[in-house]
Amino acid sequence: MAHYKAADSKREQFRRYLEKSGVLDTLTKVLVALYEEPEKPNSALDFLKHHLGAATPENPEIELLRLELAEIKEKYEAIVEENKKLKAKLAQYEPPQEEKRAE
């Protein structure tokens, strides 16, 4: 009998943990969304994965990496543009490659 109560107590603690952390609420919302789908998806598991993935807040590190990527892309575009301008400027002062070889 004592073993039964200990297991019951552990289950209750685990249930409270899931409730506090929002797991039960999130699972319930996703399952309700699946239930309310007019056309059920072929893969209920894929539906759950997709909706659970969207329900979790994004890792802050991912957002920082996105910002860093955007900055680097801007710098890259600026450097490419500057490179074009410098090549055009340089072409004004250097004879074309074919003339150099003839000399």
UniProtKB/Swiss-Prot annotation:
The alphabetical list of record keywords is: Cytoplasm, Nucleus, Transcription, Transcription regulation
The answer to keyword Secreted applying to this record is: no
Q: Which gene encodes it?
A: MYCBP
Put simply, this protein is called c-Myc-binding protein
User: Hey, which family's this protein in?
Assistant: Belongs to the AMY1 family.
Name a GO molecular-function annotation.
transcription coactivator activity
Report the coiled-coil segments. none
- Gene3D superfamilies per the UniProt record, alphabetical: 6.10.250.1060
Describe the task this protein carries out. Answer: May control the transcriptional activity of MYC. Stimulates the activation of E box-dependent transcription by MYC.
